[in-house]
């Protein structure tokens, strides 16, 4: 696993080992970042369920200004910290050990991100729960990028969000959510 493009291009990243680990493939990561390339410069990024931190680090390498990497696993946090240091992004990164829902519930309503990566363990209720919790935490022109199993059909609309597009890559799907128009006009 490596950073694909940007200032840290080619930097190898460590990953977690085990049956429960499912890092984003390079093909899927490249597709995600191709679709958001114009959103990255100076963006503030939230990577929930960060795992190795690769999505947040790829965003920083491509011009994001700050990344918050959230994971509950102590093993994941150790790998994330090593990857952050190896990529040279320690000053631009917050690494936080907590559960994603607890983090969003405790964050001040004024804390907002331009891009949110949501790649939870494949459980059918987690993405929808996180979308609802993210309601006040995404900038008006922000996006939520959800990686999930292809079989999971996410709703066209949920709370303040509407589905912009779903991309499929084999057994994996990526769904992008943005605010409904009436929300950004108020």
Language-model segments: which ranges?
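Class I S-adenosyl-L-methionine-dependent methyltransferase catalytic core
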Residues: 1-186
